[in-house]
Structures are given as C-alpha cells and as structure tokens.
Amino acid sequence: MSQPVTVDASIFVNAFSPTEEGSDKSWEYINSLRRDGIPIIVPALVLPEIVAAISKKQNNNSKFGIRLAEEIRNIPNLALIPLDEFLAEQAVSIAATYNLRSTDAIYAAVSIRFGTDLVTLDREQLARLGKIVPVKTPDK
C-alpha cells in the first residue's frame, strides 16, 4: 500500500466536471486511490465544499451534489477529519503565514498532521505550501 494522501476538493470537483480540463486525470486518480486502497485523509469540510461547487456547476442541482457527497463518503479508504481546536489553530497560522483561504489552510493542516502529500489543482496551494508539506497534482 502506498503512502496516505490528502486530496483537496478541487480534485473531486474536477473529476465530476467532465467538461473541465484535466477531468479525466482527476477521475482516474480518485479511482486509482480507491482501487489500490490508498488511505485518503481529508478534512470533513470536503463534503460541503464539493456539494456547493458541483451544485453550482449543475445549475443548483442540489440532489446531484448530495448524491455525490454520499458516494464520496462511502469510499472505504476515506477518512474524514473533524476540525478540532488544535487543527483550527494550525490552520490559522498557515493561513496567515502563507496568505491562503481558510479552507486551503485546513487541508494543509490535515496534511501536516497526518504526514501526507497534499494533492490539489489549487494554484495557491501548489505555489505557496511546498515549504511545509509535499504538494502535487494528480498527474505527478
């Protein structure tokens, strides 16, 4: 089994947005993690992030977004990490130091806590977090 990963919501959203560039790579990446049983360690906020983004892309089709969240929640090798006080404090420091959005900093904090690579399509995460956590795209 390979090393666990933290997968940003951008990967899931891209995978389920077939008209977006790289969607096929994101889809294959998620499927390979599932197939190979590689632990996926993500903040629990990944679910509302995905639902919000997909529902918006689907002309406010919230039913599709909710079904998708259920499918993701049922990935057997997925661990949803709640935001506790320590993780929040670490995310505060990361957000302030690296000028990141709060959710991006939370993914970084989860990645640091569990010693995972952070896999993302988010340009700010890719550009700013390499000094504190391994950051990569699904095709690397």
List where the protein language model places each region.
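Acidic, PIN/NYN-like endoribonuclease modules and their adjacent C-terminal/linker elements
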Residues: 1-4, 77-81, 108-140
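Short, well-structured N-terminal submotif of metal-dependent ribonuclease cores
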Residues: 1-42, 58-67
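Short beta-strand scaffold positions
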Residues: 7, 41-42, 82, 102, ...
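Short, conserved active-site loops that position catalytic residues or coordinate cofactors/metal ions
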Residues: 9, 44-52
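Alpha-helix capping/helix-boundary segments
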Residues: 11, 46, 87, 106-107, ...
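Acidic catalytic patch
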Residues: 18, 44-46, 70-96
